[in-house]
């Protein structure tokens, strides 16, 4: 995830975009920076229910107890939103993820107001799935 910005830089970059077209392009760019997900990880166990698009998220834990997230989607915007979520949860333990509320960050970005209802539901489904999987690891 080295190619992705940290939380603060994400917010700065996002607010520097002149309009929502630029913001959507930035979100898509973030999604393109995610590492490729292995074909074997695109399975029903890793598929996120509640998303209109196909979404897979894999959660692992490194030797230091830090959660590592990988994922993919067949929709560019959704993959970009996934990258935003991964940035917000970067360098956290499972317990940190369970207790961290991403919604204030979305509010700072005015993100949820500019998503279609189906994308907002999909974003919530991704967050719920990550938190639920993290809870089993904490």
UniProtKB/Swiss-Prot annotation:
Similarity remark: Belongs to the SufE family.
CC annotations in GO: cytoplasm
Gene for this chain: sufE
Localization annotation: Cytoplasm
Role of this protein: Participates in cysteine desulfuration mediated by SufS. Cysteine desulfuration mobilizes sulfur from L-cysteine to yield L-alanine and constitutes an essential step in sulfur metabolism for biosynthesis of a variety of sulfur-containing biomolecules. Functions as a sulfur acceptor for SufS, by mediating the direct transfer of the sulfur atom from the S-sulfanylcysteine of SufS, an intermediate product of cysteine desulfuration process.
Protein name as catalogued: Cysteine desulfuration protein SufE
Active site: 51
HAMAP family named among the record's database cross-references: SufE (MF_01832)
Record-linked InterPro entries: Cysteine_desulfuration_SufE (IPR023939), Fe-S_metab-assoc_dom (IPR003808)
Record keywords, A-Z: Cytoplasm
Sequence intervals crossing the membrane: none
């Amino acid at each position: 995830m080295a190619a992705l910005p940290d939380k603060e830089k994400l917010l700065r970059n996002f607010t520097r975009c002149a309009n929502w077209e630029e913001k959507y392009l930035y979100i898509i760019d973030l999604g393109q920076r995610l590492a490729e997900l292995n074909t074997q990880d695109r399975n029903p166990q890793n598929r996120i229910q509640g998303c209109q698009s196909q979404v897979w998220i894999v959660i692992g834990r490194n030797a230091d107890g830090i959660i590592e997230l990988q994922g993919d989607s067949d929709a560019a915007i959704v993959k970009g939103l996934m990258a935003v979520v991964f940035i917000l949860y970067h360098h956290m333990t499972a317990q940190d993820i369970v207790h961290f509320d991403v919604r204030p960050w979305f509010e700072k970005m005015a993100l949820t107001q500019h998503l279609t209802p189906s994308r907002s539901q999909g974003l919530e489904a991704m967050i719920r799935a990550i938190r639920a999987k993290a809870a089993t690891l904490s």
